Amino acid sequence: SIGWDWKLLASLAYKESNFDTSVVSWAGAKGLMQLMPRTARIMGVPEGKEYNAEESVKAATRYLKLMEKSFKSIPDPDERTNFVLASYNAGIGHIFDAMALAEKYGHDKYRWIDNVEKYVLLKSKPEYYNDSVCRNGYFRGLETYNFVREIRARHNIYKEKIKE
C-alpha cells in the first residue's frame, strides 16, 4: 500500500484513462493506469494482463511508491505527492532537471506550484534544456503541468463530494 487517499488514486486513474481499462495511448501506455509496457513488466504485471484493472492499480501503486522514495528529501508529503504525480507523467529525469533549474534560478526545488512546475514548462526552451544542470534534454512540459493541477483539482472535488 502506498498510503494515499483512494480518491487521489481514482483522480489519477480518471486522468490517465477516463476509467476505460481498454485504452491505449499514442505512446503505447495501456489500461486503467496507463502504464508503459516496460514499466508494467518491471512492476509485476503478467504478460497479457495490462488491461486488468486490479493488476494495473497494483502495479501503478508499486511504481508510485518507488518514485516516492526518490523524493524522500521533500519534507512536505503533499508537495512530495505533486512531484510523484509529475514523474508518473513525465518520467523522473525531467522532474529532477526542473528541480535543478529551480534551485539554480533561486526558486524552491521542494515546492511544486509556482516553483518547479515553472521549470517543467521552461524545459521546452533551449536556454533551459541545454543548461548544464539538465541531464535529460528537451521536454514539452505543458502536459505535465496540467496533469498535476487537474489531478489535484479532481481529488479536491472527490474529497468534497464523497464523505466517508
State where each predicted segment sits.
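C-terminal structural cap/anchor segments
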Residues: 57-70, 77-78, 82-83
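A cross-kingdom marker for long, charged
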Residues: 159-162
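Short, functionally critical alpha-helical segments immediately adjacent to catalytic or ligand/cofactor-binding
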Residues: 4-20, 57-61, 84-90, 151
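Secretory-pathway/luminal and periplasmic proteins that interact with or process carbohydrate-rich
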Residues: 17-26, 67-73, 90-105
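Substrate-binding/active-site groove segments that recognize
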Residues: 22-48, 55-66, 151
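Catalytic and substrate-binding regions of cell-wall glycan-acting enzymes that process beta-1,4-linked
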Residues: 79-157
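Second-shell loop/turn segments in exported
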Residues: 1, 20-26, 42-53, 72-75, ...
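Solvent-exposed coil/turn segments that connect beta secondary-structure elements
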Residues: 15-18, 38-40, 156
